[in-house]
From Swiss-Prot:
GO biological process terms on file: transport of virus in host, cell to cell
Family: Belongs to the Tymovirales TGBp2 protein family.
Name of the molecule in the record: Movement protein TGB2
Keyword flag rRNA-binding: no
Residues spanning the membrane: 9-29, 72-92
Keywords assigned by UniProt, alphabetized: Host endoplasmic reticulum, Host membrane, Membrane, Transmembrane, Transmembrane helix, Transport, Viral movement protein
Protein function: Plays a role in viral cell-to-cell propagation, by facilitating genome transport to neighboring plant cells through plasmosdesmata,.
Organism (species): Apple stem pitting virus (isolate PA66)
GO cellular component terms, A-Z: host cell endoplasmic reticulum membrane; membrane
UniProt topological domain (Lumenal) ranges: 30-71
Residue ranges, Cytoplasmic side: 1-8, 93-120
Note: TGBp1, TGBp2 and TGBp3 seem to act together for cell-to-cell propagation. TGBp1 is the main movement protein that physically cross the plasmodesma with the viral genome. TGBp2 and TGBp3 would facilitate TGBp1 function.
Xref: InterPro entries: Plant_vir_prot
Length: 120
């Protein structure tokens, strides 16, 4: 009775994991961290004026130094630098940890590219 390999789910799980990771990163970068200004009906997060009867709201908006909800802000060069540094660090660690030779994790003994030994 020949043994069958277990199904390889990595090809279907990997795109799902990447999609979830991208969604979490975009949600984190685009969520609003601005203070809530106004009441339950009138919201002025970016500044403005509103007058209704006896109610008057005048808000000048957040300062440039306040962390905003925009995806591209003044801290973007630092974020890009951190990403490039992490990519470089992963590349260097992969080069040094493998000591130059790569072997396949699963190979058939006797195949031309296989370095495994035959055990009987």
């Amino acid at each position: 009775m020949p043994f069958a390999q277990p199904p390889d789910y990595s090809k279907s799980v990997f795109p799902i994991a990447v999609g979830i990771a991208v969604a979490v990163v975009l949600f984190t970068l685009t969520r609003s961290t601005l203070p809530q200004v106004g009441d339950n009906i009138h919201n002025l997060p970016h500044g403005g004026n509103y007058q209704d009867g006896t109610k008057r709201i005048s808000y000048c908006g957040p300062r440039d130094s306040f962390p905003s909800s925009s995806l591209i802000s003044s801290g973007t060069p630092m974020i890009i630098g951190i990403i490039i540094f992490l990519i470089f660090a992963i590349y260097v660690s992969e080069k040094w940890s493998r000591s130059g030779s790569r072997r396949c994790s699963c190979c058939v003994p006797g195949a031309p590219a296989c370095t495994a030994t035959v055990h009987e």
